[in-house]
Amino acid sequence: MNEQQIILKNKDNKLKKTYSEVLITSFKGKNNSSSILLNNICANLTDKLELTNSFITSEKELKQKIDKNKYKYIISFGQKPNCNKLYIELFGNKNNDRIETSFPYKKLISFMKGNNIEYVISKNAGNYLCNNIYYEGMKYIKDNSLDIKMIFIHIPTKNKEFNFREIVKIISNYIESLVDENCWSYGIISNQ
């Protein structure tokens, strides 16, 4: 867990709970752009989780992390080869079931536009690990009536045409804006 966490106090000014607001995930891999992005994001009040490249293991890892914390948001990243834009995924699919994200993605889109970041709104997260973790994560949240909003963002492989450093900075700033917004809505008293 990051050193900076939200501290909630009750009306008697006694410590209630300390937790991170946002979980950021990627898939493991030395050359996996999602892993590189995850390890370079610098945002307060976040936890990071690198998922194993396995359907079953990655599901277990995500569910265990969710069970141990009280996140407001989960932002998952995966690598999408042969593209130079971000792909904001709206749906996770499995068999004939489709789950739509409840994440406030219109604010994300507005943030991307405001920072001149090219993106695609996608309704197809693929049919491999990325889609599986997205679908299973949203299903777990739904089945357990958790108040967590999840989004999946595909990013290009690291290449000369894609300004990776700029994306790291912008995504870090976006996550900070999410956290700041929630600090006010929770009535946070202090940050440690």
Predicted regions and their residues:
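Short active-site-adjacent structural elements
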Residues: 159-163
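N-terminal catalytic or cofactor-binding beta/alpha core of small enzyme domains
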Residues: 1-128, 138-149, 165-172, 176-192
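An accessory alpha-helical subdomain
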Residues: 154-158
